[in-house]
C-alpha cells in the first residue's frame, strides 16, 4: 500500500513539474513557429528495391586521420573537393590533400565551430571558374578558384523572405547552380545553428528553399516550413528541383517550369532513414541516408512528431541543462564550457546511438526507388554524400575522420573484344564428299568421285589405305574441329549403331571430323570390294587470305578432344574388326 502511494506521489510531482516547464513563458529555446503536431510517413520495409545487401561493407578508408567530416563531395579534373571541420575547403588528388580556401576565422578545435565556419554545400559555378560554398555559419559565398577572390552572396545577418514570417537563415546547407547561373540553396533551420542540431530535431519545421538571382542580388523563397531542408538535385531538363527533407524522411519536388510551375509535391516518401545531400545524374539521384530508421529503430526527428508537448518539454529541459555553462562561458570564456555546450547540442554526440545499418538509396526521375545499397559493419557510417567517380562510390560523412569508398555497382567490367576474325583456310574448296543429312544442314560439298576401290587421302606424302563400307551411317551429334595450322584429315566410320563418327587423329595432326569446311584436301567416297592402296591426290592449292589469321589465345575449350582410338570396320562376314 505504501509503495503504491509513493509511486502515485512521484507521478503527481512529475506532472506538476512537466506542466510548469511547458507552460512557463520565456523559457528557452525560442522558435519561429509554435510547437504543434505534424505527420511523418513511417519508413518503408526493406523489401523489393530496398532489400538488404552488403555492398557497403568492407569500405576502403582513405586519408584516415587526415580529413575530418568530409560532408559534401564534388569532382573535376580528377580532383575531389570537400569541406571539413575547421572551416577549410580542400581538394584531394590521389593521396594528397591541398588547401583551397577558408571562409571562417582561425580557430583551435571543433568546439569553436561557430568561429571556424563549417562548409556544407559545394557546387561548381556554370558562369565562371568559381566555387559556390554554403557555409553553415557564414552564409553563401562565391570563390574564384584562380585568384581566391571571395564574394558574399547571402549574409547570415540578412533578413530573408518567408511564406508567412521573414527571418534570417541559421543553417546554410545545400546548394546547386543551374545552367543559366541561378543558385538554388537551402536554409535548414531558422531557429538553431548547426551546433544545436538536437534542438532543431525537437522544434517544428522551419527550413526553406531559395533561388538566388545574381542580376538582382535577391533570394526568392520557393518553399517554407520544410523539415530540415538539405540537399538539392536539379532535373536534367531543369524543369523541376528536388529537395531533401531530412526531418520528414522524404524528398519534395518543386516545379520550375511548365503548367505546374510554382507548385510542389511529394517526390519520395517513407525513406528508411534521414536523407542528406543529393547527387543527380542523367538516370536518377543517389540519396544517402545519414542515419537509418525503421520500425525497430525510430529516430529523434520523428519519434515525437505527434506529441508537441513532449518535444517542447525535452527541448526546454536540454536548454536549461546547458544554460549555466553558456552563462559561464559568456562571463569567463573557457574551453571546458565551450566543449560541454558543443557536446550537448551537436548531433555528433548521439551518433553512438544510431543503428548499425548504413543505407544509400537510388531513385529515378519519376520518383521511384529502383535500388539500394546497405552495410552493417559501420566501415562507412553516417553517409551524407555519394560521389560516383572513377568506378567507385566515394562516401562523404559529417563525422568520419576518413573518406570511404566502395566499388560502384555500375562499374564497367573488362570485356574481350575480337575484331576481323578470319578462319585460316577461308575461301578454300570444300574437302568433304559426304552429302549433308536432312536433320542438320551442312555446308555444300564438292562432287564425290567413285573409283573401284575406296581410299582416304591423308596429309602425308605416302598414302595410307583405309576401308569404307556403303552401310548407312547414323550420327546424332557430329563432331566438328577447326584448325588453323595444318590441314585436316577426315575419316568417316560407318556403323549401324547411333554413335558419333569415330575419328582417328594422327599424332602430329589435328582431330578428325565428319564435316568440315576448312580442310584443304578432298575425301572420296566409294563402294568398296577389297581395300587396296592408291596414290594420294594432288594437294589443293591454298588461297592465302588477304589478312593474316588471328592470334590464337589460350582459352580452354568447352569440350574435351576425342581419345585416340583404333579404326573399326565391318568385314564381309559382318564382324567388327580393328585395323
UniProtKB/Swiss-Prot annotation:
Glycan-modified residues: 213, 217
Subcellular location, record wording: Cell membrane
Transmembrane parts of this sequence: 7-29
Chief location category: membrane
All ranges on the Cytoplasmic side of the membrane: 1-6
Ranges of Low complexity composition bias in the record: 435-529
Induction: By ecdysone; in embryonic cell lines.
Record-level GO cellular component terms: cell surface; endomembrane system; plasma membrane
Extracellular side: 30-579
Record-linked Pfam families: SSL_N, Str_synth
Keyword entries, A-Z: Cell membrane, Glycoprotein, Lyase, Membrane, Phosphoprotein, Transmembrane, Transmembrane helix
Tissue expression summary: Detected in ovaries (at protein level). In larvae, detected in the fat body, salivary glands, imaginal disks and gut (at protein level). In adults, expressed in the cardia, and in regions of the ventriculus including the area posterior to the cardia. In females also expressed in follicle cells.
UniProt region (Disordered), positions on chain: 427-579
Membrane topology: Single-pass membrane protein
Coiled coil: none
Record has Nucleotide-binding as a keyword: no
Post-translational modification: O-glycosylated. Glycosylated in the ovary of 4 day old females. Phosphorylated.
Single GO MF descriptor: lyase activity
Function statement: Transmembrane mucin that may be involved in cellular adhesion and the innate immune response. Membrane-tethered mucins are involved in many cell surface functions and form a physical barrier around cells to regulate cell-cell and/or cell-substrate interactions, and protect against pathogens or harmful extracellular conditions. This mucin likely acts in hemocyte adhesion as it is released from hemocytes during coagulation and is also able to bind lipophorin particles which form part of the hemocyte coagulogen.
PANTHER family in alphabetical order: ADIPOCYTE PLASMA MEMBRANE-ASSOCIATED PROTEIN HEMOMUCIN-RELATED, STRICTOSIDINE SYNTHASE-RELATED
Subunit structure: Interacts with sturkopf.
Family under the similarity heading: Belongs to the strictosidine synthase family.
Name assigned to this protein: Adipocyte plasma membrane-associated protein Hemomucin
This protein's encoding gene: Hmu
